[in-house]
């Protein structure tokens, strides 16, 4: 191919390595619900699709509500998510205890549990494994991956991109996609 990834550091070493690893789709607005649910659903087969273990663990997502405000907000989110077709629900403190036996469900404790938003198909995944899996798949498709190579400038001629200046030299190109967090 004539595609290259130019990475200032190493694959997975930037913001990718500092995310929460929670795979979920519990957002309030319809556009966010749709894109995050699509993303979440892709994780169910991503290891097979990329032939790389993403270490996806569909253990569910539970957002505890410890104030009336949190409970109302999560209930609103739950309703919006259910209307969008997501598998989620509000659960009682007893159901929280059944799913997570170690939790303190004493109503007189400092932060009592009033309920929880529960998304059984949410989970966790290894962010580094995801980055490396995609990189390996890109490499197998012929994408050049250039690590430890800082882009220092984009050259233009007559308003059109003609190349990149990098810490490892010049790269001639007509198109540039910038992906940064």
Where are these regions (language model features)?
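Helical element adjacent to the flavin cofactor pocket in flavoenzyme catalytic cores
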Residues: 117-175, 179-180
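A short, glycine/Asx- and small/polar-enriched loop/turn
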Residues: 69, 99-113, 155-162
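Short loop/edge segments at beta-strand edges and connector loops
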Residues: 7, 92, 147-149
